[in-house]
Amino acid sequence: YSLKNKKLKTFNTKKTKVRFDIPAVKGKGFKVRVRSYVKINNKKCYGRWSDYKVVIPQAKISIQRTDETTVTVRWNKVTNAKRYYIYACNDIKAAKPLWKKVAVVGSNTGKYEYNNCIVGRSTAIYVIPEVKVGKSLYKAAYVWYLYMDIK
């Protein structure tokens, strides 16, 4: 389903994981629900539907170094995002990298300058959009980040 409750696609599978590509939800997010069934005497007996799970895409980013300790992160806007949370780590190659929320910016913003990079370390960044669906706010799940060696 789209975030506006329009049915987009139905999948039948015997697998526990399904990967799919629906261009209509690219950069927008979607809702998903599942139910199982068993065959008894060649007749399908269905279980109850799960609750809807709202899936918001993580913002696709690029980073560019602008001076010795500064990088600019740019991202593609996510439809209906109300704000973006920017997270950074100044030593991604450490045994236990420490991520910090460095900024929260509005929906009209598509870039941010991070100026706390440490020379000799690898700075990593990711951006999480927050989208309003109905009366609720949803954030994208953290899936990936980009990093740059600061030399």
Residue map of PLM features:
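Fold-core signature of tandem repeat domains
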Residues: 11, 32, 36, 49, ...
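Serine/threonine-rich, low-complexity intrinsically disordered segments
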Residues: 12, 68, 72-74, 111, ...
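Short beta-strand segments
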Residues: 9-11, 30, 48-53, 100-103, ...
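Recognizes extended acidic, P/S/T-rich segments that occur
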Residues: 1-26, 85-119, 132-134
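Generic beta-strand structural signal
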Residues: 13, 39, 65-66, 107, ...
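Beta-strand-rich modules
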Residues: 20-44, 114-139
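Pro/Thr/Ser/Gly-rich low-complexity, intrinsically disordered linker/stalk tracts
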Residues: 43-80, 136-151
